[in-house]
């Protein structure tokens, strides 16, 4: 996985509500600016990962309305690759920490961390954080955003 973000929004505890800070990913297990396996640092002794049982954090992408690549992902086993692009200011990366035991299509077995999500968004709790970009749309205004996920073989 590669996430094109220099910062993330730390959370206060296991509730995963952001503290209101924006923190650099540099030198932390949160740093996905260079492609790495999701599991490489997921068990690191890092408070933010302890709070959420792994990755479940918002990454700071830039100003809303600016289209940018938010993430790339690649599976070596299948050769399937993903390029995700958005004009949102944040992306929530969730590493499937609490999937539990599930049976899927064709009897496939799914368990904790057998999948991940990249969810374009405003920062969580932004309505209560004056320094975060505002997600409020006023009556009569129109809101539009665009996120695309392109899958291909690499």
Segments the model singles out, each with a brief description of its role:
Residues 1-154:
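An exposed, glycine/acidic-rich loop-and-rim segment of catalytic or binding clefts
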């Amino acid at each position: 996985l590669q996430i094109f973000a220099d910062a993330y929004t730390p959370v206060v505890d296991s509730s995963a509500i952001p503290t209101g800070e924006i923190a650099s990913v540099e030198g932390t297990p949160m740093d996905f600016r260079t492609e790495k396996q999701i599991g490489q640092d997921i068990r690191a002794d890092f408070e933010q990962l302890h709070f959420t049982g792994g990755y479940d954090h918002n990454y700071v992408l830039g100003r809303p309305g600016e289209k940018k690549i938010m993430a790339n992902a690649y599976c070596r086993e299948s050769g399937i690759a993903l390029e995700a692009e958005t004009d949102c200011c944040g992306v929530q990366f969730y590493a499937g920490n609490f999937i539990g035991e599930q049976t899927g299509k064709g009897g496939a077995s799914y368990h904790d961390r057998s999948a991940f999500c990249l969810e374009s968004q405003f920062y969580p709790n932004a309505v209560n954080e004056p320094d975060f970009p505002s997600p409020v749309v006023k009556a009569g205004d129109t809101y539009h955003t665009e996120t695309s996920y392109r899958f291909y073989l690499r």
